[in-house]
Amino acid sequence: MAADEDELNLLVIIVDTNPIWWGKQALKESQFTLSKCMDAVMVLANAHLFMNRSNQLAVIASHIQESRFLYPGKNGRLGDFFGDPGNALPDCNPSGSKDGKYELLTAANEVIAEEIKDLMTKSDIKGQHTETLLAGSLAKALCYIHRASKAVKDNQEMKSRILVIKAAEDSALQYMNFMNVIFAAQKQNILIDACVLDSDSGLLQQACDITGGLYLKVPQMPSLLQYLLWVFLPDQDQRSQLILPPPIHVDYRAACFCHRSLIEIGYVCSVCLSIFCNFSPICTTCETAFKISLPPVLKAKKKKQKVSL
């Protein structure tokens, strides 16, 4: 029991709040809306905090022009509601309850609801960049995990994982930043899980495969909560004892640097490893001039002259 108390489990949930994708869902009169998605996320967050008093939580909204922490909020501090009553907000009573609700979870739900409402009402779409800033959200999650690991006591161990709830399509423009974040997470032994609502994500498939996480495309979006609790609530140690969805085939195609499109066969710069779909004598990334190798020229053999007698 002491070993469990000395181990901290930090779960960072990244929610895709792309207003264009969720707006299309509303136009389709779909039963699954952003508010229902956030309800499922908050149930997962509450269940994670209930699993152990030392469990920690963070929720990030991945928007089209920014990445914002929904929990802890703007006034939150590292350690708020994380099993440390000394760091709780003044208005929160850790041992009390209100209307049958646990105060810490009630405060967390209120903070998340307030932040997501503020984000969606104040969002202003400018320009043609309407892709979700997923790579930036993952980088922010890694920074938060690194900061949380510095606050861990010497006799404690912290295990961290990131859950991405993806809605909109992938952005090939973020390919390089995305791959850098994936390898940084792998180096820090941080799992990246992915729960995809709509079309498959090749980038998240690679992220889950490289870091050892789980990738799941939800068959029915209204059943999101059941899949979150079944697949993504258990941590890495508990998953080995459960029957989980089988692994999927990973799309390892790379995005070219010239058009940002996924390709199967391309040209790679031998200096900076940039990938291009068409041959270019000069690398546009590092400006290296390539030597074009021509087929070897075969010299004609000299005919031996016969000596006349």
UniProtKB/Swiss-Prot annotation:
Keywords: DNA damage, DNA repair, Metal-binding, Nucleus, Transcription, Transcription regulation, Zinc, Zinc-finger. Transmembrane segments: none annotated. Its main location: nucleus. It is found in: Nucleus. It comes from the Eukaryota. A zinc finger (C4-type) spans 269-286. GO terms for molecular function: RNA polymerase II general transcription initiation factor activity; zinc ion binding. Coiled coil: none annotated. GO terms for cellular component: core TFIIH complex portion of holo TFIIH complex; nucleus; transcription factor TFIID complex; transcription factor TFIIH core complex; transcription factor TFIIH holo complex; transcription preinitiation complex. PANTHER family: GENERAL TRANSCRIPTION FACTOR IIH SUBUNIT 3, TRANSCRIPTION INITIATION FACTOR IIH TFIIH , POLYPEPTIDE 3-RELATED. Component of the general transcription and DNA repair factor IIH (TFIIH) core complex, which is involved in general and transcription-coupled nucleotide excision repair (NER) of damaged DNA and, when complexed to CAK, in RNA transcription by RNA polymerase II. In NER, TFIIH acts by opening DNA around the lesion to allow the excision of the damaged oligonucleotide and its replacement by a new DNA fragment. In transcription, TFIIH has an essential role in transcription initiation. This is General transcription factor IIH subunit 3. It comes from Rattus norvegicus. The gene is Gtf2h3.
